[in-house]
Amino acid sequence: MIYEHGGDLDKAINKYGGKKEQWIDLSTGINPNSYPHSDINITEFRNLPSKSDILKLNEIAKRSFQTNASVSSLMGAQAAINILPVLFPIGNITILEPTYNEYNKVFSDFSRNIITVRTLHELKNSQIAILCNPNNPDGRLYSNEDLIELSKNVQVLIIDESFIDQYPEYSLSTKINNQTNNIIILRSFGKFF
């Protein structure tokens, strides 16, 4: 099951009333007053991206995020979160909380054993450890050193860096190498672009 992730104004209007133009939808991160891109060819929106388009996009992402790690482009961090239970069909899931609740929801849908913890130290010895850096909603930050050390003590470390652009020195994406091949980092292109 894929959970709703904002943007359903009809549902909100049915529950709370009002008209669409009276609502400000902050749930999607889409600017209702976007920049007028008059130089974009509309035909670009009529075709699915080609393999070469995707490879080019991944190279741009690698440069933008200053990483040599493998990159996969998806339709947002939420799309990545939704496929995690399929990528990791076995193993206990340990989530550092409080945090973005979609991790718990998607793994619960797959009847996974979920353990919630409150400190970075409690993630040690996890099969699959999940945290946000900075954390959503409280903004906690974790150092690169602490995260690399943690990665040595878990089977898989998933780090959601969707809001890291404000703190580039805390991003682990520039530190990924063949010694850290058990780390998966989720980055978001649209949060601050």
Regions found by a protein language model. Give the residues of each.
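Conserved beta-loop-alpha segment that forms the PLP phosphate-binding cup at the N-terminus of a helix
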Residues: 55, 68-93
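PLP-dependent aminotransferase-like
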Residues: 86-144
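Short glycine-rich anion-binding loops that position phosphate/pyrophosphate groups of nucleotides
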Residues: 29-35, 77, 133-137, 164, ...
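N-terminal "arm"/small-domain region of PLP-dependent enzymes with the aminotransferase-like
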Residues: 1-53
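Active-site pre-lysine segment of PLP-dependent enzymes
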Residues: 108, 120, 124, 137-157, ...
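Hydrophobic/aromatic beta-strand patches that form the interior of the parallel beta-sheet core
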Residues: 22-26, 72, 94, 115, ...
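Glycine/Thr-rich phosphate-binding loops of Rossmann-like dinucleotide-binding domains
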Residues: 34-36, 81-82, 103-104, 138-139, ...
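Redox-cofactor binding/interface segments in oxidoreductases and associated redox assembly factors
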Residues: 28, 95, 130-131, 159, ...
